[in-house]
Amino acid sequence: MDEDIFKNMTASFFNPEIQGCLSAVQSITGYQLSAVDRQPFLYFHNYLTNPEPEFVSAWRADPALETWYHKFSNGVLMDLQNTLACVSYHYERLVAIETEVIESIEKFDYRKVLGNSTIALGNTLVWDFEYQAFILAYRRCLDYLARAICTYFKNDFHSFRRLGTYLKKLKPESIAKPLIVLHEKYRPMFEFVLSEGDRKSLRDQISHYGYVQAGTINLSQRGFMLAGGGEELGFSHASGAIALSEVLNRHMANLKSCVREMVYQYVDAIRAAQVTSR
């Protein structure tokens, strides 16, 4: 690029008017994971660039293999990272909706009117929309994780549900085995988005079969409760949770822990295998 053109482009970029545009867009459309949630991705990026691994350099230098470099790097740093951010965004929206609904309802003395009765309130569509988006993004994040992991083996595979079985077929075992162990650890935590046999997951129910609600608002002397819905909320919920946010918080913690452990293990196993092969 001509030096004068580069200088003009740089000057334009740092012009207050352009910076103002960037700031405006960021404030409206931008989203960023927390510093803690970015750590596994920074760990992967550091491995990828400081210094660049020999096998990555070989991929980039070979036109027939270069596509695997892009899949390897973008699979973690773009596909997985951005989709984890998507899940986190929908989770935060769901928590905000719950908080706003409860705060608004508690401004009214409904307990005095209801006595010993319970009343159900309708039209929670916005809540439903965000819940469905959360579930779909959650499953997508897991499948992107599976796909990212398989790129090192130069394989296109995208099912987190079947990842453990698939990894058993791949070499080197020193990389695949610890990932299989982690998959076995976390898979039971994700049954709500992973179908098995005749059991349909929430993700499949939403995608293929029918409308799934976040729940139905119930008001009584006990106060506000979101009942039923995809998480089958109620006082008898298996986890003991009585609020949607409690259940979703557990889902988020499990997903973040899975991504963190698997990315760290992925990098460490690859690094060790590359050292051994020298």
Q: Model-flagged regions — what are they?
A:
Residues 1-96, 110-135, 146-278:
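Acidic, Ser/Thr/Gly/Pro-rich intrinsically disordered interaction regions
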